[in-house]
């Protein structure tokens, strides 16, 4: 009986020691998810690109930058957001769910907004979008991220903006062949 009690005490001791790193990792993951959610709320939903420096390191890298942007540094990120907010002044991001592992947070997001301003050399369409995406924020240390990857349903967005026909629409007629002057003299 003494041996059984001793074995149980030792086993419980090992079990509690083993759970401490996991608890610390869970706390870190929870803190990182909260920080990314704050970024979405305070930068994107508040349309406030000036808050970027509070959430990103100076050497931040966006691995999927918008056209015309390098994806390097917070100044480039702020410029990208300013252009995006001008094109979609009512843009809103909803976080559907988040998963954290180590220094990374993966978010399934939905972005809505109306294209009422130009974006680069593309004129405003006046049409609304409602698209899903995956956003991965990484290198989170001391509450600041150093990199990001993002994917969204670009085909759905282009269809909603009128830049592509909807799925199942008849194909466009073939282009007329170029006419050339065969009687060159």
Please give the residue ranges for each predicted region.
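C-terminal motif of bacterial Sec signal peptides marking the signal peptidase cleavage site
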Residues: 14-16
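C-terminal and inter-domain tail/linker signature
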Residues: 18-185
């Amino acid at each position: 009986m003494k041996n059984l009690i001793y074995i149980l005490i030792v086993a419980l001791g090992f079990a509690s020691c083993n759970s401490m790193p996991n608890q610390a990792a869970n706390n870190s993951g929870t803190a990182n998810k909260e920080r990314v959610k704050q970024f979405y709320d305070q930068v994107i939903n508040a349309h406030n690109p000036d808050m970027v420096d509070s959430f990103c390191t100076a050497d931040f890298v966006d691995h999927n930058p918008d056209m015309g942007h390098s994806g390097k540094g917070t100044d480039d990120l702020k410029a990208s957001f300013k252009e995006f907010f001008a094109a979609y002044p009512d843009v809103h991001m909803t976080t559907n769910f988040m998963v954290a592992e180590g220094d990374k947070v993966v978010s399934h997001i939905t972005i809505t907004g109306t294209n009422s301003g130009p974006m680069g050399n593309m004129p405003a369409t006046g049409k609304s979008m409602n698209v899903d995406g995956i956003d991965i924020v990484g290198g989170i240390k001391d509450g600041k991220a150093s990199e990001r990857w993002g994917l969204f349903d670009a085909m759905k967005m282009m269809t909603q903006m009128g830049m592509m026909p909807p799925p199942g629409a008849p194909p466009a007629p073939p282009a007329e062949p170029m006419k050339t002057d065969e009687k060159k003299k």
